[in-house]
Regions:
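Generic N-terminal initiation segments characterized by hydrophobic and/or small/turn-forming residues
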Residues: 1, 17, 21, 51, ...
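Amphipathic alpha-helical interaction surfaces in cytosolic regulatory modules
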Residues: 26-102
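Short, solvent-exposed coil/turn elements at secondary-structure transition points
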Residues: 23, 85, 108-110
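STAS-typified acidic loop motif
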Residues: 3-34
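Conserved catalytic submotifs in the C-terminal HATPase_c
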Residues: 12-13, 52, 109
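A charged, well-structured terminal subsegment
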Residues: 104-120
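Glycine-centered tight turns that cap/initiate beta-strands
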Residues: 14, 98-101, 107
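General small-molecule cofactor/ligand-binding pocket signal
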Residues: 10, 82, 105
Length: 120
């Protein structure tokens, strides 16, 4: 069976970037969230989930993001999400007001840049 979702994880300094491609639905949401959370070392400032190339996300994907925000927050780390305007995923995040749980950025550079900059 073909994998619905692609997950690429890399470290950019003190920030972990998880790039998702394909479809994030109930069949892969739980394992995807666990894989991302497990990839964030305690020394990291947090994680950026890049959803720029994600084609589809259902409510289980939204739930996974809220859970991930709580989980990294409990370790005093940050979650940021990349969802460019005009993409279906960006609209879903807007509807559920995900920005109240974690910042949503238009591009990866701004998400990583803001997280890498110490807050006063």
């Amino acid at each position: 069976m073909e994998e619905l979702i692609g997950v690429e994880i890399e470290e950019k300094g003190e920030v972990v970037v998880a790039t998702l491609t394909g479809e994030l639905d109930i069949s892969v949401a739980e394992t995807t969230g666990r894989r991302i959370a497990d990839a964030v070392p305690s020394s990291a400032r947090g994680v950026v989930v890049d959803m720029s190339a994600l084609e589809f996300m259902d409510s289980s994907g939204v739930s996974m993001l809220f859970s991930l925000a709580r989980q990294v927050g409990s370790h005093r780390q940050e979650l940021r999400v990349v969802a460019p305007p005009g993409r279906p995923v960006a609209r879903v995040l807007e509807i559920v007001e995900f920005g109240r749980a974690a910042p949503v950025h238009e591009d990866l550079d701004s998400a990583v840049g803001e997280m890498a900059t110490p807050q006063a």
